[in-house]
């Protein structure tokens, strides 16, 4: 039996031989089957290596990003590592009407991707507490003595200087931003206060502090900063990574392209304080106006800005509507309501000769107070006595005229222009009174449900005051709920409901409002949005440095890709060599029996075999 030696290109010690009988299947396989098997083997091999490369490259990146987001939330409550030279710092002083607060922020080195924002977070001291300090009174109290402002604010700056590493002072930006209290001052007094700050602070502190770093910001700016801060903490400025993330189509303001882009849906904010109410949300689509007058008003309410570090990139360009309504806060609204009761009651008594509200025995019946509670309104030396009837529906009806709604389309409170909201694809967060009204007493903060809220509010209003006091004494309400909250909860519930549904025109079946005090267990201040916006160009420095390093390490990436292609090519060459060798074996196997048969035939005829192997 013949044997076939296989040596190929292997070393001599690897040479071996096989018998055709021992491997009949391989040698008897037809050409088409061999070709199909070989092609399939090559395809499977290439597919395998492609999957391995893609999983290693992109799968790891996705896992790393998810892990980094989780890690960021965990480390966000850890003490800031002040020994890390790659940590940068920023300081914002919020000069409000009742006092001033300093916030110290920090962020690691930018990752070099021009599409990503700085990862700014609040600095935490050795005890893991946020680096914040507040002083009183408000800065506007120094309107007549501006030369004392620097001394007034020095304790805040000294506090910040103690926490920011000394070596970082000269590269740490300082922003002093004044809000409501300063807005009401004459421009000359505002200028004198800011001038004193700009003159004295650089003498005593080494922070980055230029003329544009101290200013009185408008209510619109404050609202935009608050919107930026909330959405940054929610991660709405990040790239889309999961298919289940809420997205929205956006027409980029100022873009030459008319095509809409798809990006993460941002959240709107509703904030009802004691004096005012504010709404802010992104307007993703280009808006139209009912009149030229409405267009002029809209220009003052719409803000277009770029959060990215490259002004030519439109990925982080946003169009945000911001409107602030003075007198529509919870306490201010109650005051307006009582003023109306007082004026109307005095006038009716005078015209009709009645004594309503003038004595405790003949009180004015107030549907917006809990059942049987007694209260008083005192103005100009006169007193109007009230007694609650706890009628939530009547209370809502009574306060509806205070919305000052008009018949004009696309308007809200006081007839102010409001762009359309896509209620089926939107999300809002309600802060301050929106949260207090739903949580402090009713204990239903979080996801808002109009039907459940109105039922709970009706039940509360219709409950006797004596029972409410008993529940309060037993500690059944939130720890920070006081008697003032209990007394005016009925009114504020009705006011919040009317502002939200009638004033801002949210449908009663709207399910995407979340009332909250904090976001991810953090109280988000507008100052976070302010420093995000004002430091947006700082990543350019890190991006340039990253590009320089990348140019020196580019060959590594090229080598990595080249090696994979080289390996695949070698694999195909070896596979082709094996295929050709098998074909050669098959031809030899077929020719050998044919030659043997011919030689035997010649021998049987007694003739010499022609061209037989081994003959001359």
Swiss-Prot record:
Coiled coil residues, start to end: none
Tissues/organs with expression: Ubiquitous. Highest expression in testis and lowest in bladder.
Required cofactor names: Ca(2+); Mg(2+)
Alphabetical list of Pfam families matching this protein: GDA1_CD39
EC number: 3.6.1.15, 3.6.1.6, 3.6.1.42
GO biological process, one term: GDP catabolic process
Transmembrane segments: 34-54, 560-580
Residue positions with a glycan: 404, 407
GO cellular component, one term: lysosomal membrane
Enzyme class: hydrolase
GO molecular function: CDP phosphatase activity; CTPase activity; GDP phosphatase activity; GTPase activity; nucleoside diphosphate phosphatase activity; ribonucleoside triphosphate phosphatase activity; UDP phosphatase activity
UniProt-annotated catalytic positions: 222 (proton acceptor)
Catalytic activity: a ribonucleoside 5'-diphosphate + H2O = a ribonucleoside 5'-phosphate + phosphate + H(+); a ribonucleoside 5'-triphosphate + H2O = a ribonucleoside 5'-diphosphate + phosphate + H(+); UDP + H2O = UMP + phosphate + H(+); UTP + H2O = UDP + phosphate + H(+)
Keywords: Calcium, Cytoplasmic vesicle, Disulfide bond, Glycoprotein, Golgi apparatus, Hydrolase, Lysosome, Magnesium, Membrane, Transmembrane, Transmembrane helix
Cytoplasmic side: 1-33, 581-616
Secretion signal span: none
Lumenal topology ranges: 55-559
Name of the protein: Ectonucleoside triphosphate diphosphohydrolase 4
Native source species: Homo sapiens
